[in-house]
Amino acid sequence: MVNLTIDGKQISVKENTTIMEAAASNGIPIPHLCYLKEINEIAACRVCVVELEGKDRLITSCNNVVKEGMVIHTNSPKVRRHRRTNVELILSQHNCECVTCPRSGNCMLQTVANDLNILDIPYKMKIEKQPWNKEFPLIRDSSKCIKCMRCIQICDKVQSLNIWDVEGTGSRTTVNVSGHKTIEQSDCSLCGQCITHCPVGALRERDDTEKVWDALADPNKIVVTQVAPAVRAAWGEELGFKPGEATVGKILDALKRMGADYVFDTCFSADLTIMEEGTEFIQRFTSGELKDRPMFTSCCPGWLRFAKSQFPHLVKYLSSAKSPQQMFGAVMKTYFAQKLGVKPEQIFTVSVMPCVAKKGEQEMDLFYEEYAGKDIDVVLTTRELVKMIRASHISPETLEDRESDRPMQEGTGAGVIFGATGGVMEAALRSAYFLLKGENPPADAFRSVRAEGFNANHGVQEADFQIDDITVRTAVVSGLGNTRALLNKIEKGEVHYDFVEVMACPGGCVGGGGQPIHDGEELAFERGKNLYQLDESANLRYSHENPDINLLYEEYFEKPNSHKAHMLLHTDHLESMELYGTGYCDYSKK
């Protein structure tokens, strides 16, 4: 242990602890802007400076470790003076139109400036704004960038895509898309991790709330909404709900109050995805098609974008099943439209998702039908949902639990855990076991695929399962850097699997790029626990036991992987890549 004194308090901490960590663990927070533990420890902002007795110059606390006998002052007059100057200099190159910024009230720079009581900027403002296509799902406002380099590091070290880079020198230094490309030309997966790790409002998702307001006000539109499993684990964080209070039923109630005609839980179409994907896996596995390469899940659009740009030769091993979002849209504009006796184009489908990449998926050309338009018309992130609730002047405490509308009312625990890494695999194996043996396995028989406790540096969970005389080798991976490492091992023949689940965001959808932002906190696994608890308490825990799913097959699709199911619930990723490249629309024409 190392003994030192911080602000007059004698403390003991482990060796190699940074000064910032030592102070924080003893109730002394040191302000900072650029620091991300183990990801961005470059001390670029100089806001975390502290005074070390015996040293003339201030030192940064984020990347200097403690030493025996140190006496440190985190808020001396000298520290406050230098910290204030550093923040004023940052503000002089920052667009301070806070009222119109999506991060107002949740901005690290705003918080630090307020705490330092900065009421004026004594330096000449010098703000440059680079052009950006506002139709792209991910928006960057260069006038708000503080050059903290977080986006560069999170994309490089965690997601391995290197989309962002530093360009220019001196006062002209800025961050931009690497390789002098536009964002549309890059290999951006739209995971949104750069958004959730930006300390200010320089990065955000494209705001689509006005499209929804317009649809809600259109008497000729039937607005149908769906809410993804991961949203229920996070939306209440911004509205003051205690854990367990922010139910999906309250989201459905809020959407109804806003004017939605029908409200549904995406758990229904997650169950539908399991029936299609599980059946497909058994067919491909038993036919010997997977002897060289595993079948990969296909419900994460960030992963699909990554696969098509980085490992195009593996695209043929993707499941052909659409994601729950897209299956929902296809069912709404066919089966549900027939139930209502209306034309498909009258139905306006809105998805509430934890994800920025879902906005890109919604716009993919292969999900367009002339008779119905897009499967999904608009995607809102969890953050956009919260904005709309606030704009509707809905008091959160008045929300009540509402059931999904019929006939797609039921969802199972298997559908709920889609939102956590490992959940898709576990849900699929529960039903695959039934399809192979004709009986249910214990509900928790496959829980070893859950990636409990792993982080951005170790994101792979492996498990083998014996079903009679069949051994199924599985792997679960989240985070695209981890995914790249795993795929390279598969390519080299170092590991062998039959079925692999991939999620672009560390921790799965609960850690998605559209979720509420808590600076410096990684909450994916805490949110995931919430979903697993909901599964454990669910009345139904197997997708194949969902009565509304069985009714849908009886009335419309006949059986999983039927011809009609393939027409509406599946897609050919290889063909779509040949026709559309990565599958996203051409934003240059929008």
Regions found by a protein language model. Name each.
Residues 1-9:
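Eukaryote-biased recognition of intrinsically disordered, low-complexity regulatory segments
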Residues 1, 131-132, 172-174, 229-233:
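A short alpha-helix capping/helix-coil boundary motif
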Residues 8-10, 179, 336:
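Short, well-ordered turn and helix-capping elements at secondary-structure junctions
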Residues 13-75, 79, 206-590:
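Iron-sulfur-associated redox domains of electron-transfer enzymes in respiratory
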Residues 9-10, 99, 131, 184, ...:
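A generic secondary-structure micro-motif detector
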Residues 46-190, 196, 203-218, 222:
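Fe-S ferredoxin-like electron-transfer domains
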